[in-house]
Amino acid sequence: MSSTPAVASATPSHGALPAYDTPLGITNPPIDELLARTSSKYALVIYAAKRARQINDYYNQLGDGILEYVGPLVEPGLQEKPLSIALREIHSDLLEHTEGE
């Protein structure tokens, strides 16, 4: 008997459908690649949350004809959340970030 623990696989060995869909959102882009762009996980959270707030405010102001905030810098997917858009912008190096701002 092997001492190696069993690992669930998304690709079944017997030709059936996978047990789950490929995860999207916070795992895409990968968290390790996002962390490489900031000094800490806490800085990443604040950075992404501030940008997501700007994107959300942009969508809210569109109906009023005010253009105070910058919209998404990447093509947003259908029904994509502002935080996911912000994380993709960070991953694509489309934003400049200064620690402490």
Curated annotation (Swiss-Prot):
> Pfam families from the entry?
RNA_pol_Rpb6
Compositional bias (Low complexity) at which positions? 1-13
Might you report a single GO cellular component term?
A: DNA-directed RNA polymerase complex
What GO terms in the biological process aspect are recorded for it?
DNA-templated transcription
Q: Name one GO molecular function term.
A: DNA binding
Query: What are the UniProt keywords, alphabetically?
Result: DNA-directed RNA polymerase, Nucleotidyltransferase, Transcription, Transferase
Residues making up the signal peptide according to the UniProt record: none
Which catalytic reaction applies to this protein? RNA(n) + a ribonucleoside 5'-triphosphate = RNA(n+1) + diphosphate
Under the heading Gene3D superfamilies, the entry gives: 3.90.940.10
- Note the superkingdom of the native organism: Bacteria
Q: What is its EC number?
A: 2.7.7.6
Among NCBIfam families, the record links this protein to: rpoZ (TIGR00690)
Q: What does this protein do?
A: Promotes RNA polymerase assembly. Latches the N- and C-terminal regions of the beta' subunit thereby facilitating its interaction with the beta and alpha subunits.
Listed under subunit, the entry gives: The RNAP catalytic core consists of 2 alpha, 1 beta, 1 beta' and 1 omega subunit. When a sigma factor is associated with the core the holoenzyme is formed, which can initiate transcription.
Q: State the name under which the record lists this protein.
A: DNA-directed RNA polymerase subunit omega
The organism encoding this protein is Rhodococcus opacus (strain B4)
